[in-house]
Design a protein with these regions (language model features):
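Feature targets compositionally biased, intrinsically disordered low-complexity regions
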Residues: 24-26, 38, 56, 66, ...
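Intrinsically disordered, low-complexity terminal tails/loops enriched in metal-binding residues
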Residues: 1-51
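Extracellular interdomain linker/stem segments of modular secreted and single-pass surface proteins
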Residues: 159-163
Length: 178
């Protein structure tokens, strides 16, 4: 049981995070794809700097995907054709690198090795067929020493991981340790 003196301010801050002007929304939420005519599931990610209230009254500049930290959760099924369109609105170049997923080398997001960095104001499309099931993540690999700790990361799920017999899942909450 949380001490009553802590509960009220904590509840108020959580309400402000979910309802207030923190980032452009709550992070880690499922991102709905746009289904293309050929069946490809397209996910649009805008990399941008956003004000983020990390504690009451303390606002920092977060580097975000679609205005949230962490970025949206992407979930697809094995065999899905996937397109991730990165729109770079940051003041420097960036890329998206995937962990825990099997993607073609040209789509692996390693700047100047597998692809050129995505310059400010430019877009790049990552395209691959999802293999899985897999629990993975995506994050920047360009200037990662500050872009990732500043917020450029998100969960990427392919299918559903098998659950042991007799175990009931009440809620799935992706957690990213980065």
């Amino acid at each position: 049981q949380m001490d009553a003196t802590m509960k009220a301010p904590t509840d108020a801050f959580v309400k402000q995070l979910t309802d207030g002007p923190n980032t452009k929304g709550v992070g880690n939420q499922l991102l709905a794809p746009t289904i293309q005519p050929d069946g490809t599931k397209q996910f649009d990610l805008k990399a941008e700097v956003t004000d983020w209230e990390i504690e009451p009254g303390k606002i920092v500049k977060a580097w975000t995907y679609n205005g949230t930290v962490p970025g949206p959760t992407i979930k697809v099924q094995p065999g899905d054709k996937v397109r991730i369109v990165l729109d770079n609105q940051l003041p420097e170049s960036t890329v998206i690198h995937f962990h825990g997923l099997t993607v073609p080398n040209a789509m692996d997001g390693v700047p100047d090795i597998t692809q050129p960095p995505v310059r400010p104001g430019k877009k790049f499309s990552y395209e691959f067929v999802a293999q899985g099931p897999a629990v993975g993540m995506y994050h920047s690999h360009d200037f990662a020493e500050h872009q990732v700790p500043d917020g450029l990361l998100g969960a990427f799920l392919v299918g559903d991981e098998p659950v042991p017999a007799g175990v009931a899942v009440s809620q799935e909450i992706p957690m990213i340790l980065n």
